[in-house]
Amino acid sequence: MERTCLAIILAAGESTRMKSAMSKVLHPVAGRAMISHVVDALASASISDVALVVGRDAEAVAAAANTGDVAVTALLQKERLGTAHAVLAAREAIAKGYDDILVVFGDTPLITAAPLEAARDGLAAGNDVVVIGFQAADPTGYGRLIVEGDALVAIREHRDASEEERRITYCNGGLMAIDGRKALDLLDRVGNTNAKGEYYLTDLVEIVRSLGGRAIAVEAPEEELTGCNTRAELAYIERLWQQRRRHELMLAGVSMVAPETVFLSWDTALAQDVLVEPNVVFGPGVRVESGAIIHAFSHLEGAHVRAGAAVGPFARLRTGADLGANSKVGNFCEVKKAEIGAGAKVSHLTYIGDAFVGAGTNIGAGTITCNYDGVNKHVTRIGANAFIGSNSALVAPVSIGDGALIASGSVITEDVPADAVAFGRARQEVKPGRAPILRERYKAEKLARKIAKAAE
């Protein structure tokens, strides 16, 4: 029988060092609240029950944690009296009798399933407490994990550590797994006889040992346990997340010319043999199929780019953009809530919004779908193999049939049938010899202005 597990996410901090109008756990990493990343990791570790300890911005934090993948119950911590006190905000849930209790933090968005599973494996092996630690490049300020043999005997805070203990680089990551059958008894034994009068979860190690139990430590990469308290740390975490995800995608067959300049969102999906040129930003909700090329300086969000399509350079795809196979959206084009058919070309200086563009159609430079009347949005429908001449304005709602041709510079306000040619502009007039007359008139007007100004 599988062991049951309750994960307790501590997210009740005041976030004062973040200097923000909202809780730090709501700040986005890769376009997603950092606490949502933590819940994702729990779901990946097959943990289905979560107790979320909240304080500031309780409703918003609970909403961000409810990703739909796990059952989350929000519990309000009214007083801030230390980590052990925070865990006991979930007393009723702990009392239900889970095999494992896993304590994690809401501000560690880089955590993955692996160390969480390792901690639970430690409990399954008969240990009472498992602490997740890391080897620190610079351990200054961290609590040291004092290990003898394979047992964890103490967690020593930096200020209390001896010179010898300060040389230890194995540090406390804060995350902990506790035997669910003993959790409440152990937590109730934690005292507050310290300078701050708070109840510290780290005391469990020595409490367990004093009762004849056993604690161990399992190691995770340092970056996975990186917490976030300031904007600078938020930027550092973003950088680490981006590096990790870029590396994963390149190993999966995505080419990035200058990966350090490509920015991804938490749900960016790039297929094998996609090529991404430098300085590309992927907002949430982007899917790019095999063989597509995203040229430099393009920005995509909420878009689907199908196989073999080309985007950019300097293109913007907004929510609802759907580019068909082998289609093209070129430089200085914006596409929003529009389908571009297979093989269609929108090559330059164009806005396509609330529209359907048929397969094989060519949209000339400077074309605009005029989709907004100041109150409502309207749809433009362009059939297959049509040709829209440069600098045309298509005033929606309007339909253009298959194979139709729109002359350059046209303003189209009425439907155009299939295979028709439409002109929507004033007829050109040529007046021979008129240019010198106009020039003389303009000169006279200019001289008159100068004389008038001098007389003032």
Swiss-Prot record:
Highest taxon above the source species: Bacteria
Pfam family, one: NTP_transf_3
Region named N-acetyltransferase: 253-456
Functional summary from the UniProt entry: Catalyzes the last two sequential reactions in the de novo biosynthetic pathway for UDP-N-acetylglucosamine (UDP-GlcNAc). The C-terminal domain catalyzes the transfer of acetyl group from acetyl coenzyme A to glucosamine-1-phosphate (GlcN-1-P) to produce N-acetylglucosamine-1-phosphate (GlcNAc-1-P), which is converted into UDP-GlcNAc by the transfer of uridine 5-monophosphate (from uridine 5-triphosphate), a reaction catalyzed by the N-terminal domain.
Self-association and partners: Homotrimer.
Family membership: In the N-terminal section; belongs to the N-acetylglucosamine-1-phosphate uridyltransferase family. In the C-terminal section; belongs to the transferase hexapeptide repeat family.
Full protein name: Bifunctional protein GlmU
Phylogenetic classification of the source organism: Bacteria, Pseudomonadati, Pseudomonadota, Alphaproteobacteria, Hyphomicrobiales
